[in-house]
């Protein structure tokens, strides 16, 4: 994204990471080519390099990576951007392969409540009757959905929590 990483896996992991990231930065390692092991990726890079042997390094990665990721990988690889592919050494190529299999990002924070997809915090479920969703502290007050201190991984679980707790609360209103 414009400000960091996103997607289903990140959303699921963020539930756990959010608790830690408030205390310290986290290191995220991404395999940019998960379908290939290192040897297969090296073969792929060799094949791509053979086809692009007269191109500069920075212009040779378009079959391997999304356009916006290429400048980042070029910089992190420490291979000179204008170096011709036929001049790239085996060590440089192996460094590129290692980078693609172990792409590291430092996570420094969250984007905040206004951009949150899932939130944490709220009324403790210990203070709510789970059968009726009525407050154990204040009679006649009911809680449902994201007002509760409950969050789940992606896949519709948060929606199901909202629907189920709303149903339980509504069924017990007088």
Predicted segments with their positions:
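An anion/pyrophosphate-binding glycine-rich loop and adjacent beta-alpha core
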Residues: 1-87
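Gly/Ser/Thr-rich beta-alpha loop segments that engage phosphate groups in nucleotides
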Residues: 6-9, 123-124, 147, 154-158
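Predominant activation on well-ordered alpha-helical scaffold segments within soluble catalytic domains
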Residues: 10-11, 94-97, 101, 163-171
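N-terminal low-complexity, intrinsically disordered patches enriched in charged
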Residues: 13-16, 130-131, 165
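Short, surface-exposed, polar/charged, turn-prone segments marking secondary-structure boundaries
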Residues: 27-29, 56-60, 127, 135-136, ...
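A glycine-rich dinucleotide-binding beta-alpha-beta segment and adjacent secondary-structure elements
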Residues: 71-151
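A conserved FAD-binding loop/helix module that cradles the flavin
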Residues: 149-174
């Amino acid at each position: 994204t414009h400000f960091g990483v996103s997607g289903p896996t990140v959303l699921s992991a963020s539930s756990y990471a959010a608790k830690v990231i408030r205390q310290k930065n986290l290191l995220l390692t991404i395999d940019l080519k998960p379908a290939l092991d290192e040897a297969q990726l090296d073969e792929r890079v060799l094949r791509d390099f053979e086809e692009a042997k007269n191109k500069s390094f920075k212009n040779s990665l378009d079959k391997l990576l999304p356009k916006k990721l290429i400048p980042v990988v070029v910089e992190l690889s420490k291979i000179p951007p204008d170096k011709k592919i036929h001049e790239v050494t085996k060590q440089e190529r192996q460094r590129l392969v290692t980078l693609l299999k172990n792409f590291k990002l430092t996570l420094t924070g969250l984007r905040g409540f206004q951009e949150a997809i899932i939130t944490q915090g709220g009324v403790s479920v210990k203070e709510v009757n789970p059968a009726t969703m009525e407050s154990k502290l204040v009679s006649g007050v009911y809680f449902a959905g994201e007002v509760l201190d409950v969050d789940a991984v992606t896949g519709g679980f948060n929606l199901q929590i909202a629907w189920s707790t709303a149903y339980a609360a509504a069924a017990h209103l007088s």
